A protein has these predicted regions:
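SAM-dependent methyltransferase catalytic region
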Residues: 1-176
């Protein structure tokens, strides 16, 4: 519980991924089925973060959530082979991105360099250039390959995000 710091029992959690994992625990009878559907639940859970500092925390929280649900169901630690697959899915589905441009923040070089002694009107917004890399996401079901975020965004059905991690407002909505 973020307001008290008290741990919430697995069976009482109501997060988006928690609800999926609770249903999986209820309807599966074998470890293999549980692992299969838990991976599918993580595949269907996307999120991006602008700064990068909260990204590690979000990834760790997803990993710990799945591990705690596994332990709650089977009363043993999840196997390493399952955790490796899970780690890959988490790494692809939670990434760093400027949500306004669909690109990696702060990756373009400033041709003038940083002026460490100027504290006036410093523009710390990401530099957007033609060569700035586009973010890529993994299409687990339809393509089974990485695709550019712009391509996914352009599809008629689009992509919904379960989480946008971070502490807004870091982005200026007038840019991008």
């Amino acid at each position: 519980d973020v307001s008290t710091g008290a741990e919430i029992e697995v069976s009482s959690r109501r997060g988006l991924l928690d609800r999926k994992l609770l249903a999986i625990s209820h309807f599966t009878e074998t470890r293999e089925d549980w692992q299969h559907w838990a991976l599918r639940a993580v595949e269907a859970t996307y999120g991006y973060e602008f700064q990068g500092d909260n990204l590690l925390i979000a990834r760790v929280n997803i990993m710990k959530t799945v591990m705690e649900h596994y332990f709650s169901k089977w009363e043993e630690a999840a196997p390493t082979s399952f955790l490796r697959k899970l780690t890959n899915k988490i790494a692809w589905n939670l990434w760093q991105m400027d949500g306004l441009s669909g690109r990696i923040p702060y990756c373009a070089e400033d041709p003038e360099g940083a002026d460490l002694f100027s504290f006036g009107d410093i523009d710390i917004r990401p530099l957007l250039s033609v060569g700035q890399p586009v973010c890529r996401v993994y299409s687990w079901r339809s393509d089974c390959q990485s695709v550019s975020y712009e391509d996914v965004k352009a599809r008629s059905c689009g992509m919904r995000f379960d989480y946008i991690v971070g502490n807004p407002p870091y982005q200026d909505e007038t840019i991008g």
